Amino acid sequence: MLPAILAFCGFYVAGSNQQMFNDATQVVLMRQGTRTVLSMQNNYKGPPEAFALVVPVPSVLHEGDVKTLTKDVFAHVEQMGAPRLVEYWEQDPCHPEPPMEIQFAGGAGVAAMPVRKMAGADLGVKIEAQFTVGEYQIVILSAKDSSGLETWLHQEKYNIPEGAEPLLRPYVESGMKFFVAKVDPQKVKFEDGRAALSPIRFFYDSDRFELPIRLGLANSSGTQDLIVNILAGDRYEVANYPNVTIPTNLDVTPMVKDKFPAFYAALFDRTVEQHPGAVVTEYSWAAGSCDPCPGPTLQPGDFATLGADVTKENLGYGYVLTRLHARYGKDIKDDLVFKAAQPIVGGREIKNATGQLDNEAKPASQNNFQGRYAIRYPWTGPITCDKPQRGIWGGPPAGQTQQGPQAATGLAFAPRGQVQLAQALAKPDQAKFGGGAFSGS
């Protein structure tokens, strides 16, 4: 079965014997120097009893390191980095406009938490800090033994997912701390049976830039997907797994207009089938610009919300937004480790030396890579000149309205099996593509 969920770097534990699953998490990492700011928006599917989030962190976090956010910034980031669908019309071959690239317009307060007497010392567990942020009751734990940590969580009435102790062990042995954010369901709104939790952000300093995903396997029933957005001065890729880029500049048939998320899901599935174990780069672009733009660009206020207010230097419009998409199962061995990479370009309406559009990423002087897919409408009017110039694309004929680029958002819930690539691609031979295997490594 293909995954219909997005995983996260921690696991969720419920205060009942029912399993708590995470089915859609958005993660945004801001990185500058040794500082990492991690922001996440969680959707939960489970009973409304007390539940918690457990995430390994490299150091003890304090009240000022944690805050809640509003949800709109995550929708903004997702829209900017998402694959986009555009429409082009062939211009009058006898009166073409000069060829050019087409552009489109496009915390809660913190309160003290009562201290409870626990037998943590006997279990090798120490409460390093505890505080409340919004609906989150947070404790920062250190542990000398993974079994002791598991026992402590059991004593606190949490039903740890089966198989959690071996997953906790490497983090305990490496000296990691544990961010445990318990949620008070009386402070949470439930919409259609789903908890609408406030996004949460915290930051820390570490020489290593990584995301601990192995602990999330405790909630996994099989294969999981994870989308990570990184805001930094450079493009980023993973250092410990293969890197590929999503095939781009593919022309599609008009039927894709109503099934774009399903089309992209099929394209991504084909890509990971051809490159098992690889992490897919779906977007890498200056965060303050885009072309085509599916919506407003990210603004200084967005950067501040996502961490620029706690980094040494606010890069303003100098941030690069990188979107990485990973698929993994229970056999994954290592967390995702990130490294800076050279700029790439791809997914633009710029022809190469052979007069074709490249379907793969290429090295470049600046980051301009996106997953871009186009519906093209050939010229159907009269041709009244001796030397028509075909293949010049632009906006629609006079009097016809053009919709802006369509972004494939909400891919955690994109339907699978509705689109066959061979029928969706305007050039069926592209269904055999092996492209996208660019790596700056």
For each feature predicted by the language model, list its residue ranges.
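A mature extracytoplasmic/lumenal domain signature
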Residues: 42-44, 57, 142-145, 185, ...
